[in-house]
Amino acid sequence: MSVSAHAPGRRRRALLLSSSLAFGAAACYADGPLHPLDGDGGAPLAPGAPLSWSVARPGPYACGHRTLDATYAQPGGLPARTIPVHLWYPSKVAAGDHPVYRNVFPDAHAWEGVPLAPSPWPSGFPVLVHSHGYKGFAGNSARLMCYLASHGWLAAAPEHVGNTIGDTPDPLPLAVYFQRPLDVRAALDLLAAPPQGDPLEGKADLTRVAMSGHSFGVYTTWAVAGATFDAGAIKAKCDGGMVAACTDAQRAVFATDLSEKRARAVVPMAEARNDFFGAAGYDAVRVPALLMSGSLNPVGADALFAAVTGVDLTWVDVKGGCHQLFGLGNTALGDPACQVLSDEAGFSLVNPWVLAYARYHVLADRGAEVSGLVEGSSSISPLVQAEHKAP
């Protein structure tokens, strides 16, 4: 396997294409609804426990979607903040209406408001919480959210109000940088204590949480994971006008703990450069991280992988991958260069990797398929290169 895209001198894990793993079939399951309906409107479940379901294809559940609001007290002298939290969840019903995110982006893979399935996990559903990108929206990575939901996970994505497709000022207020990780905390708090009588009440297992983020959501992900902030760099951004509405009270927020201890593994996708953390801030992270990038979207993942020394860090790079490989789809922005990897082919590489990593680190899955992928003895595809370094 070629390693020319990466800087020399690092430990490369040889990833072997294994015919015993059914990853080659993943793209066959990527189109259309996850389930044909059976006679009573339900979807039959595959036999066996959830950890026996192959990560290479969607799981046996349909993907439900709904939205709840979360309100929390903000630091830095700001008023209470209310944000919508989008939820994708396992269902046995694949019927009815599809969600349309921001009234613009339809999602044919999810079903609005269908009943929540009983949890296949005795302790409740494990959770993936996700942070969208700059000028994004909660449903930007809905294909990943539905993939996890099909395998029996709850997926939650807060809409980062003030930094979405319709309401982002330039320059960004400093508060956005602490609101993002606090929005994630609020989303998890909502799952821990939903409205009384809500079907989600008591159903989320908040001891088993993974976190992912796309683009600017990578900043959120590292902050949630415990990266520490460089006060000098933040002051320089304020003084230079790169961020707005800086106050002493708001700068002081970054000296507090903005991490989320419930997150047991993190997946930053399609971004690696953020000087809010300084040279050493990443090394404060104490949970495993899966850094994902596309070869056609150089964001400095190689430099970050080389620089970080204190983190259990895996770097996965997808040949032909563009910025929206981890969001709306690899070809979504219309760049002709991105056509080399179709949306469906891209999803069939990214989604199984994220699921496998979450199962390995959050659910302690050491089955042959998952451990082979995460530990490096097998691969989804020759298009995927992976590298690992221990702290």
Label for each model-derived stretch:
Residues 25-27:
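C-terminal motif of bacterial Sec signal peptides marking the signal peptidase cleavage site
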Residues 29-31:
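Bacterial signal peptide processing site
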Residues 192, 218-230:
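Short glycine-enriched nucleophile-adjacent loop
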Residues 320-322, 328-391:
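Alpha/beta-hydrolase-fold serine-hydrolase catalytic core, especially in secreted/extracellular enzymes
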